[in-house]
Amino acid sequence: MRAAVIHEHGGPGCIQYETNWPDPKPLDDEVIVKVGAATLNYHDIFTRKGMPGIKVPMPCIAGLDFAGEIVELGKDVKGWHKGDRVMIDPVIRHLPSGGLIGELRPGGLAEYCAVPDQNLVKLPDDVSYEAAACLPVAYGTALRMMYTIGEVKKGEKV
């Protein structure tokens, strides 16, 4: 498959466009998503440059924010089907190590990505992949700021 691969931390030149990168294989609780759209955000730049205290495994495929279609299911995946349109929540909450898709595991700057089923968000038919790919980190940042800085409480309107 084609992928934008970071082989070492550095400037923009450290990203290599690979045309024969191995296709991902799903673990039992994962799906393979054919990426329909991906966007870049500040965290992708941090992943490329390197971040103090976070060891990013190399080579790395960045891309936290992406959306696409499920094309393969791991054997334990329930409630999802081939052809389902999904957006990805990049925060890995189900593992003690945590981390992000596109940081500690391959992300969406590739044709295909293995994604834990817990990180899938059903995408309505009237929302484009491009629009959905703009949401995860930007939305998560805005939501967190509403709670932490704005101290918005349940029932309040913004």
Regions inferred by a protein language model and the residue ranges of each:
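Short polar catalytic/cofactor-binding loops
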Residues: 7-11, 38-40
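Residues that mark the start of a beta-strand
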Residues: 2, 30-32, 157
